């Protein structure tokens, strides 16, 4: 079985309004804004879940056992490239702005949304923008902290 290459195969949108994060519609997604075209290659930061441990060992146990506990995310953010002139994305993703980060993986990023697409939907509130230190031979980069406000749907299907 061949490996799945991620180059050019991750689509990321910010979508302010989704009625059901388990089944976002093509119309809702098309009303959002594509942001993967303004992200650095490592710009989708911290959107990997971690599962806590619940110690369920017994006093009589001779082996420590655990069960799956709460799921959490840590340090989620978007690392983006600043645009010259009017930068709509920079001016939109401001402190307190609520939106949904929608991620589709393993399909060419230029492929339009379609019913039955598998996506991840993260309801977030933006933190303060952090402009990164200037570097030689580099573009102006900035980060937007994203606070996940309700449980995301990591296996949503586009309706």
Locations of regions flagged by a protein language model:
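Compositionally biased, intrinsically disordered linkers/stalks adjacent to structured regions
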Residues: 22, 30-32, 147-158
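Structured, beta-strand-rich domain cores
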Residues: 55-113
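Hydrophobic transmembrane signal anchors and adjacent membrane-proximal interface regions, especially
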Residues: 12, 71, 95, 119-121, ...
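Short intrinsically disordered coil segments
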Residues: 92-97, 141-143, 158-159
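Surface-exposed flexible segments
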Residues: 24-33, 90-97, 111-129
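Short beta-strand and beta-hairpin "edge-sheet" elements
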Residues: 105-155
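Solvent-exposed edge beta-strands and adjacent loop segments
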Residues: 1-79, 125-140
